[in-house]
Amino acid sequence: MPRFIRHHLYKTGRRFAAMFFIAILPLSFAGCFSGRQSRGGQVKLQGAGSTFINPLMQKWVHEFGNLEPSVKIDYQSIGSGGGIKQLKEKTVHFGASDTAMSTEDLRSAPGEILHIPVILGAVVLTYNLPGFESRLRFSPETIADIFLGKITRWNDQKIAADNPSVALPDEPLTVVHRSDGSGTSAVFTNYLSKVSEEWKTRVGEGTSPNWPIGLGGKGNEGVTGQIKQTPNTIGYVELAYAMKNKLPVAEIKNKAGNFILPNFNTVTNAAAEAISETPDDLRVSITNAAGPNAYPIASYVYVLVYREQPDPRIGKTLKDFLTWCINDGQKHAQPLYYSPLPAEMVKRAAGKIAMISYPETGGNGNINPASGTNN
């Protein structure tokens, strides 16, 4: 080959190599920046909502992270109302709520939202009576009158009628309730609306009812704290919070007329009563169930997700995490005072998880839920 041709090719090759290096340089830095964001391919999920499920959700997040080190899940325990609000605003990938979203809420959401039941829990009455050792019992009528402000002392005749062999203290009774938007409140007021016509008419049900009386506490944690540090109080919390704080739990008279303690069997029995009546969208209330051994203030906890996920890595990780929660994750329920899903509900929840869809390619696993674009 003539020398000038070799020289021309040499110079051309050098220019091409320089141009190629300049062309790929931004891409190389972009790749490094993306790698730093996702920490070598890490997928980040952001969730928020129910304080009811928080002890179990934190356990799930920890255990799933051990199984899938590339997945980071952050769950903020801000109350079901807050979780639903953030999900509708698309600032989180999933919400969690102790009750199903209302039809109005679903219609106002910017996309189709799926309800995926992941666990069962109990709302309990707990109290602080210094020096009092007996376990108390409450009928539905008595509970309604306490929270309506009609019963103001612990030795009221209605409480005495529910506890005939107990010497009740002659002390003022103080109610503690949630101050934030709360699925726990929604479950409790749903129950009260079923058992008390006066409650249904005067107050009704919801995440933020207009309480007739009482002190407010933020989250299950706040209500538990108020009761623990304030003598002669009574309030409602998720079972795990009462047990963890060594607070007494009352027996509640159920629809069949039996006084029932919340536990694995009685909460599961409440769910079993409602399986056949559960609609296709899985939004169901299981309070005041009819079974003789059913605890009357029980509820599913739902994880709420958009059916259409814009980022495939987020969509796939959501499906993997939720599938694990309703299967292997159920073994962590009982030690934390929750009840596992009935087998039939596991099957139906799996069907909902399978409906989550996402594109085949694209995304980096750090999607901004609000915009649908990658960070």
Located regions from the model:
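N-terminal targeting and processing segments of secreted/endomembrane and organelle-targeted proteins
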Residues: 2-4, 20-21, 32-35
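Bacterial N-terminal signal peptides
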Residues: 18-28
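Bacterial N-terminal signal peptides that target proteins for export
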Residues: 4-19
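Flexible loop/hinge segments at secondary-structure junctions
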Residues: 32-375
